[in-house]
Amino acid sequence: MKNLRKIGSKDFPLIVSWYKGHKQAVPDPRALSNTGFIVDNRVAGWVLLTNSNIALIEGIISDPSSIPSLRRESLNKLVGFLIDFCLAAGYTQIIGITKHPRIDLLGKRYGFKTLPDHKILYLNAADDGDNEKD
């Protein structure tokens, strides 16, 4: 696909500026997979591949200063590519996590379903917080 490439270490400062522009927390680079892609220098996202048939699309972010119609076009290209990438690699289940309504709508257009009664649980062993076990 034209204007789509793997994310490299030189892209990280640009992507950090996007997270900051959206007033979102910047992810720890160690938490990002090496299967990240950037489209048109406007949007980026990652695929986390597992040792099962499940892949996770994660970390989709856009340049907040880009023209909205071009950003939407690039986002559509990215999501379509990430899904095709997962399917071509043999993954039959793809999970996406978002709180952004536009990403939610785009996912539904691609056939994703939501689980409205579920919560996302996570554990970050690097947190200094209380990991209380009941």
Could you tell me what each predicted segment is?
Residues 113-127:
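Conserved catalytic-core motifs of GNAT/GCN5-like acyltransferases
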Residues 34, 111-114:
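Short glycine-aromatic motifs
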